[in-house]
Amino acid sequence: DMTLQSRLFEQQLAFAQRYQKPVILHLKGREKEALEYLRHYENRYLVHWYSCDAWLQEYIDLGCWFTVGPSLPFDEAVQHVAACVPLDRMLVETDGISACTWCENRKVAPKEHGAILKRSMHKISEIRNISYEKLQEQMVLNCEKFIGQRFPF
């Protein structure tokens, strides 16, 4: 029931805004509808593995953060996101074993996650014309900034 889902989504956004908690969004197929709600609740939003050309600029203009998923090397839509999103609001993710298995079209072992993240980082370096080392530094800063906590290393 979309009416119930919409009402609950709005309640969650209001709760997160009230208590200043970031919101992680999986928007696949509901990008336009979610955007309308987000405009009413100022907050920190992280858009998980966005791959839609439509409304990308609107999400950027709202100050949203974005993750780039493991399909980056093969998916032009995700490459477009990696090219357009401000570098200081981007994070890299694997989205877990099943997502990596889906992207790779084969069974992926947990020990491969590091290599998959590195491959995505190299692709972002290429797309953004930035050194891998500089990008690593930026991703650490981004993560610290988004969660509001410094890492002890």
Where would I find each of the regions flagged by the language model?
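Divalent metal-binding pocket/active-site signature
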Residues: 1-62, 73, 80, 129-130
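Mid-to-C-terminal alpha-helical segments outside catalytic/metal-binding sites
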Residues: 14-18, 114-153
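Short, acidic/turn-prone active-site loops that include or flank metal/cofactor-
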Residues: 50-51, 70-75, 95-98
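Short, basic, glycine/proline-bearing loop/turn elements
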Residues: 63-67
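Short amphipathic alpha-helices and their capping/turn segments at secondary-structure boundaries
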Residues: 77-87
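Short acidic/histidine-rich active-site segments
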Residues: 88-110
